[in-house]
């Protein structure tokens, strides 16, 4: 996380700390409306900025899988050297990111944590999207499997018209809603053990919604949370879904993309995250939820 982003979030947190919402139905409704305004993405956009004609994620995923690739270029950002594709089908054009890297290394150390086996995999993008949907977390752009130029990989819809979170004039109109999205991010990153979250893989769209991309270094086979101390405020919907999720549902969501050891460690991190939240509730009460 860059110094600029840290300063930005610190400023937003200060604003949030100064705001109180009435403990009334009207007050709660106002707060809910603010959050909905900041987090709803409406329609996905094409390269021309116009909404794409997809009524659901399933329709968009089918397009990503089957549309013709009419253009491709390298994306000069990131470790895995993804490609930007232009897809076209039935007169509809959309851009997408295609990742195809599959690298496994032994005995890797990152930020003080040792990984006996470390995998950098495009398949983790699909796992992150499917797990996010299972949690009710609308923060990971639709992603699916795809082949291009003989290479198997993942293809993810492009977030058009993004804002620069590190620009000096960046101001989220609803600081509470914006900061809550970063709390969702911390919860999710702990669950999937995402060791590579940085400003280049967080996208802010024009509605000030955060989109989380580039999860190729998540899901490492380590039965530990990433940084439990960062989980301090909890999205009740995500918490409820995680708590009610059984191991079969978890396995079904990610088994096409994770191996047995990675799934076992993910299940253990789920348990640790549940324990973390239960400890927070015991200490601070139901106020930890939003």
Q: Language model features by range: what are they?
A:
Residues 148-191, 231-233, 240-264, 271-272:
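ATP-dependent phospho-/nucleotidyl transfer catalytic cores
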Residues 52, 120-124, 194, 258, ...:
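Extracytoplasmic/periplasmic, Sec-exported soluble proteins
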Residues 9-95, 260-290:
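Regulatory N- and C-terminal appendages and interdomain linkers associated
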Residues 166-170, 197-202, 223-224:
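A short secondary-structure junction signal
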Residues 88, 117, 204-290:
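C-terminal catalytic region of ATP-dependent kinase domains
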């Amino acid at each position: 996380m860059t110094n600029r982003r840290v300063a930005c979030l610190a400023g937003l947190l200060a604003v949030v700390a100064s705001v109180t919402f009435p403990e009334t139905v009207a007050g709660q409704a106002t707060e809910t409306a603010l959050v909905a305004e900041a987090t709803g993405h409406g329609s996905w956009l094409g390269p021309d900025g116009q909404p794409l004609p997809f009524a659901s994620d399933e329709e968009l995923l089918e397009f990503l899988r089957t549309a013709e690739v009419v253009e491709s270029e390298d994306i000069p950002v990131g470790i895995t050297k993804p490609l930007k594709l232009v897809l076209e089908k039935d007169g509809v054009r959309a851009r997408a990111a295609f990742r195809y890297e599959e690298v496994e290394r032994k005995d890797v150390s990152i930020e003080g944590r040792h990984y006996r086996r470390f995998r950098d995999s495009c398949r983790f993008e699909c796992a992150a999207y499917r797990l996010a949907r299972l949690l009710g977390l609308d923060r990971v752009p639709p992603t699916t499997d795809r082949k291009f130029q003989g290479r198997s990989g993942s293809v993810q819809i492009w977030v058009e018209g993004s804002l620069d979170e590190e620009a000096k004039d960046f101001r989220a109109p609803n600081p509470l809603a914006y900061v809550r999205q970063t709390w969702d991010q911390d919860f999710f990153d702990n669950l999937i053990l995402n060791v590579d979250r940085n400003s280049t893989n967080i996208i802010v769209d024009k509605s000030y919604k955060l989109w989380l991309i580039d999860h190729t270094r998540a899901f490492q086979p380590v039965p530990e949370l990433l940084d439990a101390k960062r989980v301090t405020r909890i999205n009740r919907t995500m918490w409820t879904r995680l708590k009610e999720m059984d191991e079969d549902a978890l396995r079904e969501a990610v088994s096409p993309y994770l191996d047995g050891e990675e799934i076992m460690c993910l299940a253990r991190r789920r348990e640790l995250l549940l324990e973390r939240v239960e400890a927070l509730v015991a200490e601070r009460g139901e106020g930890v939820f939003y």
